[in-house]
Design a protein with these regions (language model features):
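PLP-dependent aminotransferase class I/II
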Residues: 2-144
Length: 144
C-alpha cells in the first residue's frame, strides 16, 4: 500500500483562534494517484479494486458493511439532467466551450473532479473519538 495512506486522515486547516467549527459534515477527496478505476452513472457505479488504491464507491460500500452511512459528494448542478446542456462558468469562461478545437487548453471542471474523487463521510457532531477512529480505520483498509 502507498505510504501516504499509512498515515492518519488529515483535516483541512482552519483558524482555531477565531472560529468555532461544529464539524457536522465531513467529506474527503482521494488523491488522483490513489484512485482505482471507477465509472458513475445516474443510478449505479462500477469500480475495479486495485491494491493500494480505492475510490468513493468502494469506500461507501465498505462503510455500509459496518452500518456506517456515507454518501457521494453532491453532483454538480451543471451535470444534473435538467441542466446538463446549459452553460456553466469556469475560470476560463464557459465550461461547455471546452470541446472547441480552436480553443487551446480548455477548462478544468473542478466540480466534476470533486464529485468523481470525493465522498461525504459518516458525520455527526456527537461522534466520539473512538467512532471517528473506527471510520478512519475502515477507510484506510480500503487502500490496502
Amino acid at each position: 500500500a502507498s505510504d501516504v495512506y499509512k498515515r492518519q486522515v488529515q483535516m483541512n486547516p482552519y483558524d482555531e483562534k477565531n472560529s468555532e467549527p461544529n464539524f457536522w459534515l465531513s467529506c474527503m477527496l482521494i488523491d488522483k494517484d490513489a484512485m482505482c478505476q471507477q465509472v458513475r452513472g445516474e443510478q449505479k457505479a462500477l469500480y475495479i479494486s486495485e491494491p493500494g488504491k480505492s475510490c468513493p464507491t468502494e469506500i461507501l460500500e465498505t462503510l455500509a458493511k459496518y452500518n456506517a452511512e456515507g454518501r457521494p459528494i453532491w453532483k454538480p448542478m451543471h451535470e444534473q439532467p435538467i441542466f446538463r446542456m446549459n452553460p456553466f462558468i469556469t475560470r476560463e469562461g464557459n465550461g461547455r466551450a471546452k470541446t472547441n478545437a480552436y480553443i487551446e487548453g480548455g477548462s478544468e471542471d473542478v466540480g466534476m473532479d470533486i464529485f468523481e474523487r470525493g465522498l461525504c463521510l459518516p458525520s455527526d457532531n456527537k461522534m466520539t473519538a473512538e467512532e471517528q477512529d473506527q471510520i478512519i480505520e475502515i477507510i484506510k483498509s480500503c487502500f490496502m
